[in-house]
Amino acid sequence: MGSQQAAVSFLSNLAKAAFGLGTAATVLNTSLFTVDGGERAVIFDRFRGVMDQTVGEGTHFLIPILQRPHIFDIRTKPHTFSSISGTKDLQMVNLTLRVLSRPEVSRLPYIFQTLGLEYDEKVLPSIGNEVLKAVVAQFNADQLLTERPHVSALVRESLITRAKDFNIVLDDVAITHLSYGVEFSRAVEQKQVAQQEAERSKFVVMKADQERRAAVIRAEGESEAAQLISDATAKAGMGLIELRRIEASREIASTLARSPNVAYLPGGQSMLFALNR
């Protein structure tokens, strides 16, 4: 009888000890939280609200039920968004912007209070569209291409300044895509065609001018040659002309002699006399 009571007492004490250990393990487990690399934690206290200090990497203690950690990723993350903006000459332009952002670590408690954990998704698209529309409105549509480095620099400076108002740090800002509306694209094509036609017309005019100059030079040369021949004739008489005529006749006779389909008939009536005999 005594042994049974001792066994029951032992089991009861063992159950109490196991329950105590389990409760202690649960409390200990809920009192610990881990912050991984590239993260920071903001502690919310039910009595004091959001704590001013952020918690760094590693395992830390908190008061169960009264305190709760909220983990922020502080590594640089890419974000891409598009905006349709109007230019100074009232053309619609579609731009795509890529930014690399991260939160300002010392301001994480304030970011959590005002924006929450998804601060970047709430802020960046809004201020990105705002800055793009403001900058694009300062340029004509064609200037966005010819002055693209200047446009990108203005967008970068304005967006970095605007993001600081929300305690967000931008490591890089870049315009990755730029396209125009259908009407402007058609106008650009027509302008290119017109420029090509103008260049072609300019070439035709230059060619005609060169041909005209060549004709003038050729006419002047022929005039000078005729004058020289006239002067030579006046000095030497008709002998020069007869010499040129003989040379031309010799060239013609030489050409005809080499042709197999040409027969030479001597002048006069001697051939006719030979036929009559």
From Swiss-Prot:
Mostly expressed in proliferative tissues, including vasculature, shoot and root apical tissues. Expressed in roots, stems, leaves and flowers (at protein level). SMART domains: PHB. Keywords: Acetylation, Cell membrane, Cytoplasm, Membrane, Mitochondrion, Mitochondrion inner membrane, Nucleus, Signal-anchor, Transmembrane, Transmembrane helix. Pfam families: Band_7. One of its GO terms (cellular component) is plant-type vacuole. CDD domains: SPFH_prohibitin. One of its GO terms (molecular function) is protein-containing complex binding. Prohibitin probably acts as a holdase/unfoldase for the stabilization of newly synthesized mitochondrial proteins. Necessary for mitochondrial and cell metabolism and biogenesis. Required to regulate the ethylene-mediated signaling; involved in growth maintenance in the presence of ethylene. Functions in nitric oxide (NO)-mediated responses and in hydrogen peroxide-induced NO accumulation. This is Prohibitin-3, mitochondrial. It comes from Arabidopsis thaliana.
